[in-house]
């Protein structure tokens, strides 16, 4: 899905036609406030759709500008899941460049080449797909962490600290065999084969 936010109806219609001709779905909004109202109707961070999305956004619009909107998207944590491509006139190129430095995916200067724009849209959708995959994997890791027992968590903190099974057993006042069982269950639940993999996975889950 490609969201279009531009105050010029003729631009939105032309973009929609172009995207439709390339078999890309789109949905248009005449101003940033309308798009924000759409976003407010759903918790996109907690329940992001499986299909990739991107946003074609005009830099200058009456009311909320594209620059203000992208700042709000950044605040909501949506900028990776929904890459933003700015549509800009020649005089706004420096502004668009600054927006890219803030997190926008890219900008396209008007008048633009159809093929060039579609190429950037497809690249943005690919980036969205990758971000959705990373997010889903992170959610699964966090779910696995939530399913650990208290004892498995105690063993886990010591495993990633580099403690040997004997030391873990002494600290927790349990047998080495019991530590081995908890360690095996921990590795199985977290789908890892070593303490190094476990430590790396936990860092990714926190990210």
For every predicted segment, state its role.
Residues 57-58, 88:
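Active-site residues of response regulator receiver
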Residues 67-80, 98:
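Short amphipathic alpha-helix used as the core "switch/output" element in two-component signaling
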Residues 61:
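Receiver (REC) domain active-site loop signature in two-component systems and cognate sites
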């Amino acid at each position: 899905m490609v969201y279009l936010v531009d105050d010029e109806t003729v631009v939105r219609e032309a973009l929609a036609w172009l995207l439709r001709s390339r078999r890309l779905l789109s949905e248009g909004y005449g101003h940033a406030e309308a798009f924000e109202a759409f976003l407010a109707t759903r918790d996109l961070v907690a329940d992001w759709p499986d299909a990739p999305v991107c946003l074609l956004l005009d830099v200058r619009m009456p009311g909320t500008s594209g620059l203000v909107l992208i700042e709000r998207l950044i605040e909501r944590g949506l900028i990776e899941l929904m890459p933003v491509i700015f549509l800009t006139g020649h005089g706004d190129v420096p502004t668009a460049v600054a927006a890219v430095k803030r997190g926008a995916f890219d900008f396209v200067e008007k008048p633009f080449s159809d093929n060039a724009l579609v190429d950037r849209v497809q690249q943005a959708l690919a980036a969205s797909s990758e971000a959705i995959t990373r997010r889903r994997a992170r959610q699964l890791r966090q779910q696995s962490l939530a399913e650990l027992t208290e004892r498995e968590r105690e063993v886990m903190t010591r495993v990633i600290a580099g403690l040997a099974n004997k030391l873990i057993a002494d600290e927790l006042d349990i047998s080495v065999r019991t530590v081995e069982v908890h360690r095996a269950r921990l590795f199985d639940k977290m789908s890892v084969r070593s303490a190094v993999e476990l430590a790396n996975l936990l860092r990714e889950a926190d990210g």
